[in-house]
């Protein structure tokens, strides 16, 4: 049976001498792997459409085994993501996160839209690190690790402002409860508001978000600690971003 779907390439791995197994993320069927025969050949008609991050239309044959790619046409190749090392690193981070936290053949319609929007935002010059943090936050409910950001995670008070973020309590703590977690991250009210924005923001309405480098480092550390505790995924792209940072490859990401 032939099936045609719009999809985003999450990853592509070599298979044999000339073939690739391509993981597509589709709106209708979720994540699925297809065999692209001859895709490793330089003149292959599949060479361009099986590159990571490509958004395209794919026709594949679904038999009893691994689906076989019959045709592909790129809708958007996101050229900036292919040639800018920083943008590419964060795009890889986001696609790897989606790959790790989704199961095959389980569609999540809004996640397809989120991923496509995130790649477009990075490609057009939005702050790639902030887009990555937004996706970090939005993936938490899908991972079964939704944080409590609307009240104190301990006493449930909605009237006292948050003064800390607790990994142990999975959310904000108020001034009456901060002593209950000595490892909680102290935060300011503006930081708490930013944290909420990253969680609730509509990606279609993300404009130019200006965040200081120090604040971004703190966001990354808090979210990574939370992920390590409740989600437990290890991302190769995260390690690559850390290496880039150490080598000064993220030096364009300065305080604004």
Curated annotation (Swiss-Prot):
Coiled coil: none annotated. Gene3D superfamilies: Nucleic acid-binding proteins, Recombination protein O, C-terminal domain. GO terms for cellular component: bacterial nucleoid. It comes from the Bacteria. Keywords: DNA damage, DNA recombination, DNA repair. GO terms for biological process: DNA recombination; double-strand break repair. The keyword Iron does not apply. Involved in DNA repair and RecF pathway recombination. Belongs to the RecO family. This is DNA repair protein RecO. It comes from Shouchella clausii (strain KSM-K16). The gene is recO.
